[in-house]
Amino acid sequence: MLWLLLLAAVGPSPAAASVPLIRSVTVSVYTKKLVPVEDLKAEEVRVSEDKRERKVLGVERDRRPLEVAIVVDSGGTVAAAYRSDLVPAVVDFWKALPPDTKVALWSTAPAKITDFGGDLAAAETKLRMIAAAGGNYGFDSMIDACRELGRRGIPRRMIVYVGSGSLQASRTGTSALARALGETHVTPMAVLILPSARGSFSGGPSGDAVEAFDVQGYFAQVAKAYHGAYVEALSTLAVAQWLRQFAADLNGQYQVRYESEAGPEGVVKVEVRRKDTRVRVGRSVAEIARLE
C-alpha cells in the first residue's frame, strides 16, 4: 500500500508524461490568383505551437459537409448598387462554393430570404425583388443565422456578411453576435464596404440609444478571435473580387494533423512552403472541443 501512495505522490513517469498527442487544425490554401490549391503535401507544411515547431503527420482535403449563411445588406446605404453590384456578386459567390454546399440567405431588414438547401435561381429572383431601403439591422440577421447554423450541426459552418458599415445595433447585440459565434462554432467572413465605416447603436430591432461605434475594428477583432476573414471593399464593384477570394478559401481547405504535447493547446501557426500561396488558419479540433 505504501508504494502505491508514493507512486501517486510523485505523479506519472517522464516517459508517460511525454507521450505525444495528435491534434488537427483546418487550413485554407489558395494562390494569389485565387485558385484553390488541390495537391498540398505534408512536406510543404510547417506547423508551430507557441513558437515550437511540431511534426506534421498528415494533410487531407477537408471534405466534410459545409453550410454557408450569407447576410446581404438591403439598407438604404447600398440602394443605388444593390441590384447592379451586390446581387450579382453574391450569386457568383454561391455558384463558386464547393459542390453540395448548402446555402441560406438573409437580408438586413432583418429577414430570412431562403432556407438552407434552397435553389439558387429562386434565391436570385427573391434577392432582386428586394427594394433596398431603410436601416441596416445586419447584427440581428447574423445572430439569427449563427443560431440556425448551430442547431443544424453541420461540421463546417460559415457566415458571410456583405454590406456597408452603416449597421444599427446595440451593445447587447454586438456582444450577442460574438457570443453566438463562439457557442455555435461558426466561422465569420465579412466584406465591409467603405467609406461608411461607422455604425450606430440605435433604436429598431436591436434597441438602445444612438451612439457611433467602430465597425471596422469590431469585424477585424471578431475575425481574428474566431479564425475567420475580414476585408474592406473601397466600392461596391470590388465586392465580387473579395467574394471570389472567400470562395477560393473555402474550396482550398485541408485538415492538418500534427504531433503536440499533453496540456492546453498553444497558439498554432501554419506556413505553406509553396510560392505565391495564401493561408488562413481555422479552428482546431481542440479549440472546438473547448467551446463545447
Residue map of PLM features:
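Scaffold/interface architecture of coatomer-like assemblies
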Residues: 11-292
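Sec-dependent N-terminal signal peptides
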Residues: 1-10
